[in-house]
């Protein structure tokens, strides 16, 4: 989402206090803030987005990606370890456009990169979304430029670097 300049920290704090929002971060990239919304139902997610997030006056635009959750390549145990490791200082979300019908091939390739803590095929403007974590920025940079962007079937990608100062 994009917001009024200077309101990022306030909005992130507000978003993190909303039931159903599991994390929000400021980013460097095309968008100012990225949030993860979780609910047992699709209607629950829609309500959080349309009735809560989009009603915040300082938020100027939103873009929603919906996870497909069709394949379980990132196992729960790995996610638990990722959560424990999740205090890595360098983090980013990477959104990816793939060649037509190659989303799951890309997802399978991503599952072999240890620094990718979460990834899924998404519905929306992009095809795949992944969260990358590393202990330092240079490692994160190498994973994105030499690991992710070099994979076959990727047409374009956009990186949203998480800004920890706004958390």
Residue ranges of each PLM-predicted region?
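A compositional/biophysical signature of low hydrophobicity enriched in polar/charged and small residues
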Residues: 1-167
């Amino acid at each position: 989402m994009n917001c009024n300049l200077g309101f990022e920290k306030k909005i992130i704090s507000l978003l993190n206090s909303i039931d159903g929002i599991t994390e929000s971060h400021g980013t460097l990239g095309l968008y100012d803030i990225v949030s993860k919304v979780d609910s047992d139902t699709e209607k629950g997610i829609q309500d959080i987005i349309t009735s809560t997030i989009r009603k915040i006056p300082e938020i100027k635009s939103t873009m929603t990606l919906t996870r497909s959750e069709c394949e379980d390549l990132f196992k729960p145990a790995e996610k638990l370890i990722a959560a424990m490791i999740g205090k890595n200082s360098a983090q980013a979300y990477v959104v990816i456009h793939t060649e037509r019908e190659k989303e799951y091939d890309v997802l399978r390739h991503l599952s072999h990169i240890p620094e990718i803590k979460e990834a899924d095929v998404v519905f929306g403007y992009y095809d795949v979304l992944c969260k990358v974590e590393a202990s330092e920025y240079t490692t994160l940079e190498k994973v994105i430029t030499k690991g992710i962007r070099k994979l076959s079937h990727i047409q374009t990608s956009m990186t949203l670097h998480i800004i920890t100062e706004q958390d």
